[in-house]
Amino acid sequence: MKKKFHFAVLLLLFAAGRRSQAQNTIFLSQGKIEYERRINQYARMEDENSWTELEKKTMSQFKTSYFDLLFSHGKTLYRPGRESADKGSSFFIDQPAQDNIVYADLDNEKSVSQKKIFEEVFLVQDSLRKIKWKITDETRAIAGLSCRRANALIMDSIYVVAFYTDEILTSGGPESFSGLPGMILEVSLPHQHITWSATKVEAVNVPDAQLAVPVKGKKVNNSTLLETVQHSLKDWGKQGQQYMQLVML
């Protein structure tokens, strides 16, 4: 009888602990996330056989950039963040997606992106990217938040690994990545050797004025932009293909 009583007490204590933990979890509806984007330039060079060891030595292995994502309820704004200490040269003469500003209205499934491609600025107005995610059981902590892994395939051939947290209610993410039951804190494109990873999450008030829709650039949709970029890069070979993939993310 005593054993049963002790076991019942332990169950009650465990349940109370779990309930207390759930009550202490803060679910964010607005705030700011900093992402670090890392491109493994050496790996990209190995994919492009024309590069020499001498050329490889002129640049650092990883090209690092920082971006901020502001979010408030069903809206997000992804934009360039603080300057990186990385001053090394780039695999690309013109670093693609370096100045991207991406606004997403998640409730209405609309996106407006301002993208600089070479010397021209485009304003891409379209619906949100449709991504068929497959959620897995793998978990990890990112920026202090518990995250779960999901996999997907985009643009017919790009394999995506993402980790999202349901502790942030907004279902957004960096660049055009969204559609999971929470905020995406890490995205990896293994075959493109690129990773976006949240370095910090701040619970701050985000006024509507800070989520301003970008307005600068030639108005296009994703299909028109793809045709334009393909035409411009038709003689670039494999490097052109890699550039185009970054532009269209």
Features from the language model and the residues they span:
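Bacterial Sec-dependent N-terminal signal peptides
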Residues: 1-28, 246-249
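Extended soluble regions of mature proteins
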Residues: 23-249
